[in-house]
């Protein structure tokens, strides 16, 4: 973000507005709602401003601008139609280290007035950083229709009970869970329907019941207490990287989490959607360097749940497609930890859709197979002969690292060297790249263009459709007969080395014990 959103306390603080017309009126109206003591400085001040600021706490000064009036001002607003004067006001305020806003001149603003949704004490500010104020206002209009007015009353009610809740519920986690139940339950519905007295009574009853349960729990033995405080684990598929491809359920659980254990293939954009104050722990793995071994991850999930925490295990793609989600829930079951599994869009689906390569097509492919492309050193390529079916699409996960061995093994097994194959890098992301060729040419093409990980391979006749069906980031940057590169060139900025290393985190996990190819066939 280019500007940081802050909420400024201006109650009983001096604010200087230079200008007395309609623009000054709009700013004065907003600032007066925040309780500011407003001084308007202008040789002529509109009747509307005079009426708005009739309270004695405000001051109207009918004079030309003079920087001496800046003294003790918390913020300054330049709202004149004189460009030279506005620059002077900005210069004087800057010299005095006072934040200044020159209306409709973003480069002279230390702060920006956002579009505001006011449900006092709940306030939402929306800003385009001065780039598109009309768009910000349109977003505000949408939010106004989505957020009931009752949220303000609900927040005030919570403020009145805050002290009692803190006294009766000793733990931070317990208080947060209590308030979430209040805001998502009967109390909020009563408030939104206008039954304020009933809402107050319901909140008091909920608090009394919770306090009684805490007292009863403290009187039991440790085993009962541990059972009562058991949390829950959510195994969540984060999808391929584009946050718009998350499911609603994934987003909801991510925003409820107390702690998030995430893999290397979870994009920063998706991770940012988790609850802000949740603990975020990286447990990704890369070849021969695991941040946390799988058994350690299993133990972390169990222990966090036993602490009463809501745990999100966030995995790139889908948890049950080469993601070890099954191993993790086996561990959870053995410890009687409740869990949920939220599917995600797996990389194969995203890469195919965003590259314009249908995985099945009546004229080209009647089935699709998902296979891990990583081979252990020296492992026999016994499975390659199973990939000779030309009316089948094969998707190799994590195949880029072993691309030369993979393509040569397929050719040696009898697959035509002219078989179309594509590399899709950073599928669904703005820096997505697609490189197409054949089994015979793709290794040399990859050496030339250096598409980065994370990437997967799609092999089969359907790859030939990419030429006509590509739609996303559809910039053709290289063409040589049937070889295509879309979405970038060799000079395209690559992720930083740490991120590239993290992208390999799943490779070691996906190699089978016998060194063969692990696979999933969908007919």
UniProtKB/Swiss-Prot annotation:
| Record flagged with keyword Disulfide bond | no
Any idea which residues bear Phosphoserine here? 128
Q: Which reaction does it catalyse?
A: uroporphyrinogen III + 2 S-adenosyl-L-methionine = precorrin-2 + 2 S-adenosyl-L-homocysteine + H(+); precorrin-2 + NAD(+) = sirohydrochlorin + NADH + 2 H(+); siroheme + 2 H(+) = sirohydrochlorin + Fe(2+)
| Coiled-coil segments | none
Q: In which pathway does it act?
A: Cofactor biosynthesis; adenosylcobalamin biosynthesis; precorrin-2 from uroporphyrinogen III: step 1/1; Cofactor biosynthesis; adenosylcobalamin biosynthesis; sirohydrochlorin from precorrin-2: step 1/1; Porphyrin-containing compound metabolism; siroheme biosynthesis; precorrin-2 from uroporphyrinogen III: step 1/1; Porphyrin-containing compound metabolism; siroheme biosynthesis; siroheme from sirohydrochlorin: step 1/1
Q: What is this protein called?
A: Siroheme synthase
Q: Which organism is it from?
A: Psychrobacter cryohalolentis (strain ATCC BAA-1226 / DSM 17306 / VKM B-2378 / K5)
**Database matches in HAMAP family:** Siroheme_synth
């Amino acid at each position: 973000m280019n500007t940081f959103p802050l909420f400024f306390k201006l109650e009983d603080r001096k604010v200087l507005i230079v200008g007395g017309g309609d623009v000054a009126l709009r700013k004065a109206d907003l600032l007066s709602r925040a309780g500011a003591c407003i001084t308007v400085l202008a040789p002529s001040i509109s009747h509307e401003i005079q009426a708005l600021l009739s309270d004695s706490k405000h001051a109207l000064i009918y004079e030309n601008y003079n920087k001496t009036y800046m003294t003790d001002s918390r913020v300054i607003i330049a709202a004149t139609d004189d460009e030279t004067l506005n620059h002077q006001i900005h210069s004087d305020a800057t010299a005095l280290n006072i934040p200044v806003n020159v209306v409709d001149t973003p480069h002279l603003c230390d702060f920006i007035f956002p579009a505001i949704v006011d449900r006092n004490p709940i306030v939402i500010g929306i800003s385009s950083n001065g780039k598109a104020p009309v768009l910000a206002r349109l977003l505000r209009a949408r939010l106004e229709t989505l957020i009931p007015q009752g949220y303000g009353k609900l927040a005030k009610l919570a403020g009145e009970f805050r002290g009692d809740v803190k006294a009766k519920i000793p733990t931070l986690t317990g208080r947060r869970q209590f308030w979430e139940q209040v805001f998502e339950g009967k109390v909020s519905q009563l408030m939104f329907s206008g039954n304020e007295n009933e809402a107050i009574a319901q909140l008091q009853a909920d608090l009394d019941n919770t306090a009684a349960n805490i007292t009863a729990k403290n009187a039991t033995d440790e085993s009962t207490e541990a059972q009562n405080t058991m949390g829950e684990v959510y195994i969540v598929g984060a999808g391929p990287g584009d946050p718009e491809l998350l499911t609603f359920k994934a987003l909801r659980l991510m925003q409820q989490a107390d702690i998030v254990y995430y893999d290397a293939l979870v994009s920063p954009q998706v991770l940012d959607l988790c609850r802000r104050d949740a603990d975020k722990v990286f447990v990704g793995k890369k070849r021969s360097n695991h941040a946390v071994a799988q058994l350690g991850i299993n133990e972390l999930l169990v222990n966090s749940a036993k602490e009463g925490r809501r745990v999100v295990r966030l995995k790139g793609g889908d948890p049950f497609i080469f993601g070890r989600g099954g191993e993790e829930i086996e561990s959870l079951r053995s410890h009687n930890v409740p869990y949920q599994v939220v599917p995600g869009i797996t990389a194969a689906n995203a890469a195919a859709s965003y590259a314009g390569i249908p995985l099945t097509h009546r004229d080209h492919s009647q089935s699709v197979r998902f296979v891990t492309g990583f081979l252990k050193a020296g492992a026999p390529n016994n499975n390659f002969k199973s990939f000779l079916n030309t009316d089948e699409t094969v998707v190799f996960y994590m195949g880029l690292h072993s691309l030369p061995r993979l393509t040569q093994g397929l050719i040696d097994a009898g697959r035509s060297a002219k078989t179309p194959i594509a590399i899709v890098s950073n599928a669904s992301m703005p820096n997505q790249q697609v490189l197409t060729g054949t089994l015979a040419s793709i290794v040399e093409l990859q050496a030339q263009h250096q598409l980065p990980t994370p990437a997967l391979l799609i092999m089969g006749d359907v790859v030939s459709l990419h030429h006509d069906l590509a739609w996303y980031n559809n910039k053709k940057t290289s063409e040589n007969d049937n070889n295509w590169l879309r979405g970038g060139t060799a000079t395209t900025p690559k992720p930083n080395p740490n991120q590239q290393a993290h992208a390999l985190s799943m490779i070691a996990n996906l190699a089978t014990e016998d060194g063969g190819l692990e696979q999933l066939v969908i007919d």
